[in-house]
């Protein structure tokens, strides 16, 4: 019988999103920028550096905490009763490396994962080629990458995706048994319908539009499928691992009601909702301490990245060429 990933939360992630390869990446970029003798490939110095460091575990990257905690759902028993029995826990989460790295450098990625106890067994290493096309056969629920072009392509293919900011602050260690994820609303969880009104007509028109349509659910945005998948994982429950989600939005009353009613219509719950009315999100996120935050506007992502791991969802009207 063939193996498949049906029923799992599938996260595809690039090596730079999972591990801190920024020093190595600078060597790679230097190879591309400078002329090389005939026959010398631009990634030769990079490959040599990665091979020389094969036994040196890479430092955790911006999405490391998120991945480590999600994988812990595979180790956590479903209930206290199961925790007292030697039964194999359900395998609910699959993490797959999708990398522009070469296969030789891929050895260090897998070895680093093994060092940290991350049970990651699958990956593709495409030596400079975009890896996003492999998201479809994986049926991925999330793709994290440092390459904006790959993120855009994934979003166009209907996969929730975000460009990680490698220099983001790292996640808090205060919640070892709880995955904390924060989402922006418009153009992330929801469609950009309301955001288009705001950008075209201003705040007053936006508030009036949303108050008028409070009973009409918003269409889903690019991250609705991920929120639903996390909700299913949350509902399954374990005796050890939990998920806590937050909606962190620039909306304020009366526009809050349509957002809440939309989630109710989807039969999906979030644990916290912050209606900030344009206040900077960063300090609120610092207090929530998420393992990751997703937003469609780079200004909000930069604000967040000073305090928590953050990623840019290049979708909607706020992003030139967005979907």
Over which residues does each language-model region extend?
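Short acidic-hydrophobic, aromatic-tinged amphipathic segments that line or gate anion-handling sites
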Residues: 122-127, 145, 162-164, 273-277, ...
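Short beta-strand/turn micro-motifs composed of small residues
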Residues: 15, 99, 145, 249, ...
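Short, structured coil segments at secondary-structure junctions
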Residues: 116-119, 138-139, 157-158, 266-269, ...
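Short hydrophobic/charged patches on amphipathic alpha-helices used for structural packing
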Residues: 132-133, 282
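Conserved acidic residues
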Residues: 121, 141, 179, 271, ...
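Asp-based, Mg2+/Mn2+-dependent phosphohydrolase catalytic module
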Residues: 2-9, 19, 148-181, 185-212, ...
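Alpha-helical substrate-recognition element adjacent to the catalytic core
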Residues: 2-129, 175, 184-275
């Amino acid at each position: 019988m063939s193996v498949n990933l049906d029923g799992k939360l599938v996260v595809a992630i690039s090596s730079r999103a999972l591990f801190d390869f920024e020093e190595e990446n600078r060597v790679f970029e230097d190879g591309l920028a400078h002329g090389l003798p005939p026959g010398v490939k631009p990634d030769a110095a990079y490959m040599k550096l990665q091979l020389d460091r094969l036994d040196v575990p890479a430092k955790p990257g911006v999405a490391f905490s998120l991945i480590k905690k999600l994988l812990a759902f595979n180790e956590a028993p479903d209930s206290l009763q199961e925790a007292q029995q030697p039964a194999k826990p359900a395998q609910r989460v699959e993490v797959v490396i999708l990398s522009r790295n070469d296969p030789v450098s891929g050895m260090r990625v897998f070895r680093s994962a093994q060092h940290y106890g991350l049970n990651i067994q699958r990956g593709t290493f495409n030596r400079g080629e975009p890896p996003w096309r492999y998201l479809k056969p994986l049926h991925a629920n999330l793709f994290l990458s440092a390459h904006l072009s790959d993120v855009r392509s994934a979003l166009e293919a209907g996969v929730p995706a975000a460009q990680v900011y490698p220099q983001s602050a790292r996640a808090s260690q205060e919640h070892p048994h709880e995955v904390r994820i924060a989402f922006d609303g418009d153009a992330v969880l929801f469609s950009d319908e309301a955001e288009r009104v705001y950008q075209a007509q201003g705040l007053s028109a936006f508030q009036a539009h949303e108050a008028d349509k409070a009973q009409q659910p918003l269409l889903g945005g690019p991250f609705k499928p991920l929120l639903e998948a996390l909700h299913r994982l949350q509902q399954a429950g374990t005796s050890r691992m939990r998920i806590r989600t937050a909606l962190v939005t620039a909306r304020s009353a009366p526009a809050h009601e349509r957002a809440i009613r939309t989630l109710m219509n989807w039969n999906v719950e979030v644990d916290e909702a912050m209606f900030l009315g344009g206040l900077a999100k960063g300090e609120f996120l610092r207090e929530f301490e998420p393992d990751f935050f997703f937003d469609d506007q780079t200004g909000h992502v930069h604000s967040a990245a000073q305090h928590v791991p953050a990623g840019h969802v290049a979708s909607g009207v706020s992003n030139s060429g967005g979907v």
